[in-house]
């Protein structure tokens, strides 16, 4: 069958830069699904994305669907003809539906009888007849949170559409997509190259756009070019560019023809904390900061122009002029804020609401202070430093710098605390209280910082759950999932001796009578245990491994972690599957027995050699396991328990558990209960599949 290259390009106004890659990839994924569902065989699908276009190029697309034989079974012969051999109404109706007469139908004979049969060869539809609808369907399923209308049309898309190009080989496919008739015309760069030009064939794309339109349509090629040139530009001035992937992606999505340039700002601004300067360079201006080999900020920045200008110096001067007032603002705020101590902002926190039912930021600060001190005591941190850091934790929110540059909260508290002569551990804790800010982020470095970070997050969790505003579905306005996972990560990875139950109880107690939800403690603990499930699944642990541990509901995160890792290791042992099945069998037997079990196994009632051996093994193991359980050495404990495989197998093969003699039966059930209880010291392995 003939194969050709297919191209679709949707020319738009500037697309949202932070969504450009995801839109293009979703377009490709959706269209691949459409082609596969339509039975159109194809080769690789390349996606292209630039600020004003989304495009797909499909290699080796079949010219048509394959022909296929269709069969439609009709009525049974007994129902298809009457006593005189004439077709019944059922047979005639079926034949009409197939477009034939009854006498044209074939007959299908099977061991169950004979039926009328219609058999025909259905020719596959041409690709050009199918493609417009497939493109439209793929576009309609893009992940667009907000759609736009433009002109007087009811058509909606992420941005207004100006051109649509559909080419199959050299043939232009007529269609109207998103209200725009298709054509061969595509648009080039706004200020360089040709404004519009015609494509002769799909294979010319994207090279013709590069040569005549001065647009690099290949997203990853554009990104690689920016990265390479920015690294080289930084090296030329003896520095290293901060090319964070998120900003690199955003800049890639803003330019069609990237030109990397280097600019400067006055060295006097380096007296301002680097975080504030970087915030305005990266956040407001989309510039890449430059650091020296020691990690110190240089008075330079790298930016990406969207035009290859004859007068690059003018563009550089323009960008330097734009950033200067922002840096001057930061300098002014920094000087002004330091005219008073950080602690002087405490009274002003009373005028800022944390949450209507939960009081002001000052109220929250007082709770954090008390809770941080309590946590510090539990984990062996300096209580005085933890309470001091808790007291100052929100003071920087009232500074000019943080008001203007919101992402500098915490870090500016650290700088102002240092200026005031606070202890270094207190100052660092003010910055690290927000850690981890996102998945994979660093954790607080000191125990004091850990205490404040946990206190802040637990106060929010207790308060919001206490007024019944817990996350619902995808909505989590107070970022409670992130807060819960942050607490768990800190406690687990820092191996802190904290219990979620007592921690939550203390956080709730500090609210006094403000919380109306009577089950708030249980709700918060259950929510946090649920976060464990998500966390360990992402780490690659099996769902039933996590469920086995959750069945025991251990509320000490470090202990929970040890159990999960122990069960994951246990699963790799050759004895695991048999012992998991045995535990399931034991659980079922005990659930159905209805007998009241004894506290201890009575040796005099043990009759069979297999039950005597199992009982002896349990006694020996109990002595070995007691210190392992006490120290949380669950992996070693499960390895020891794995030695029970043969005694357990022998027991079930040779012993009748539900004996007629009541005392013997109860003794055997008690023995099995002792066996199960040993495993339950770690997890309920009966749930393992």
Swiss-Prot record:
It catalyses: tRNA(Gly) + glycine + ATP = glycyl-tRNA(Gly) + AMP + diphosphate. Keywords: Aminoacyl-tRNA synthetase, ATP-binding, Cytoplasm, Ligase, Nucleotide-binding, Protein biosynthesis. Belongs to the class-II aminoacyl-tRNA synthetase family. It comes from the Bacteria. PANTHER family: GLYCINE--TRNA LIGASE, CHLOROPLASTIC_MITOCHONDRIAL 2, GLYCYL-TRNA SYNTHETASE. The keyword Ligase applies. It is an enzyme of class 6 (ligase). It comes from Edwardsiella ictaluri (strain 93-146). Tetramer of two alpha and two beta subunits. GO terms for cellular component: cytosol. GO terms for biological process: arginyl-tRNA aminoacylation; glycyl-tRNA aminoacylation. It is found in: Cytoplasm. Its EC number is 6.1.1.14. The keyword Ligase applies. This is Glycine--tRNA ligase beta subunit. NCBIfam families: glyS. InterPro entries: DALR_anticod-bd, Gly-tRNA-synth_bsu, Gly-tRNA-synth_heterodimer. GO terms for molecular function: arginine-tRNA ligase activity; ATP binding; glycine-tRNA ligase activity.
